[in-house]
Amino acid sequence: MASSPLTANVQGTNASLRNRDEETADKQIQFNDQSFGGNDYAPKVRKPYTITKERERWTDEEHKKFVEALKLYGRAWRRIEEHVGSKTAVQIRSHAQKFFSKVAREATGGDGSSVEPIVIPPPRPKRKPAHPYPRKFGNEADQTSRSVSPSERDTQSPTSVLSTVGSEALCSLDSSSPNRSLSPVSSASPPAALTTTANAPEELETLKLELFPSERLLNRESSIKEPTKQSLKLFGKTVLVSDSGMSSSLTTSTYCKSPIQPLPRKLSSSKTLPIIRNSQEELLSCWIQVPLKQEDVENRCLDSGKAVQNEGSSTGSNTGSVDDTGHTEKTTEPETMLCQWEFKPSERSAFSELRRTNSESNSRGFGPYKKRKMVTEEEEHEIHLHL
């Protein structure tokens, strides 16, 4: 009998635990159905908020003062602020914006009885910037020359937006022409009456700052310079040409590196092409030693053959000794001449093509080039035979 109430308590506790488990299971199922079920999503609730700042209120007295100040001062918000006294300039400006929009709206479509007729003041002109960006000028030719400050001369650094080429050109102008100034303010000393002994066109010429004034300086210097002699190098020959008089003619100071000799009757394979001197002309005419075609050489030599034969007997002392076979001795040449022009004898003509041979061609060179040279010589020899 004593064990019966204990068992009853145990059974009651077990039943209560089962009921709790069932309730929690049912709640979990319902939560899953709400969260993961079909397309039925719970709407998000916005967080509640409260407006703490209240909108400023304008009384009738303040509005009347505002309208009076608006008629007196226009859009001068600081003066309107002083006139109203109870509102700041920012509040007055926002109130004026709303008031102007209301006046414009009622003037166009609504009744004008609610709002007093008032003339809206025009907007104030925009302020010019205190430190504007440097602007590009339209015409560079209209600009006057820039004045050089004494501090800039000491430091040699331009203070304005100009290229270093322009500043260097200004310095060169100042150094080249001490008696002339670019502008009346260009020198640090007080302006003095300076006169130059230049020509009339130079006095009328106005110096303006250009992008590249170095070309102008070069033109001025070249016009002032005296005529000078120029040396031209043509095919290994140096020729002196003077600017005065005939620019194309050669002066008596022209010289050639090859010796000057009259043309003998016969030329060997080792004889160089000489230079002919004509007694009627005062100047020397140098033949440019360039390879010519065979036909041109033949035509020239046939025309001058008779004159050469007549001169050959009288000029024997100047040339080398002639052998019985008709060959002349080899004349001495300068050591600076590494290359020489040679005549290759042929059967049909007195002269053939000019060959240029190098003194070091026997010791230097690559094998295939030598073979090619031999092949070309054989082909040309066959051509001479056919001619």
UniProtKB/Swiss-Prot annotation:
GO cellular component terms listed in the entry, alphabetical order: nucleus
Q: Where is the HTH myb-type domain?
A: 50-104
Keyword annotations for this protein, in alphabetical order, are: Biological rhythms, DNA-binding, Nucleus, Transcription, Transcription regulation
Compositionally skewed regions (Low complexity) per UniProt: 172-200, 312-323
GO terms of biological process kind: auxin-activated signaling pathway; circadian rhythm; regulation of auxin biosynthetic process; regulation of DNA-templated transcription
Q: Where in the cell is it found?
A: Nucleus
Q: Where is the composition biased (Basic residues)?
A: 124-134
Q: What is its main location?
A: nucleus
Entry annotated with the keyword Hydrolase: no
Per UniProt, the ranges with Polar residues bias are 1-17, 27-37, 141-166
SMART domains per UniProt: SANT
Taken from the record, one Pfam family name reads: Myb_DNA-binding
Keyword rRNA-binding in annotation: no
- Supply the induction statement: Circadian-regulation. Peak of transcript abundance near subjective dawn. Down-regulated and strongly decreased amplitude of circadian oscillation upon cold treatment.
Instruction: Give me the stretches of Basic and acidic residues compositional bias.
Output: 324-333
Tell me, according to the record, the phenotype of the null mutant. Answer: No effect on the regulation of core clock associated genes, but shorter hypocotyl length and higher freezing tolerance. Rve1 and rve2 double mutant has no alteration in the period or phase of the clock. Rve1, rve2 and rve7 triple mutant has no alteration in the period or phase of the clock.
Looking at the record, which segments are called Disordered? 1-44, 105-200, 306-334, 350-387
DNA-binding region, residue intervals: 77-100
Q: Which GO terms describe its molecular function?
A: DNA binding; DNA-binding transcription factor activity
Q: Which domain of life is it from?
A: Eukaryota
What does this protein's UniProt record list under function?
Morning-phased transcription factor integrating the circadian clock and auxin pathways. Binds to the evening element (EE) of promoters. Does not act within the central clock, but regulates free auxin levels in a time-of-day specific manner. Positively regulates the expression of YUC8 during the day, but has no effect during the night. Negative regulator of freezing tolerance.
- Could you tell me what this protein is called? Protein REVEILLE 1
Protein source organism: Arabidopsis thaliana (Mouse-ear cress)
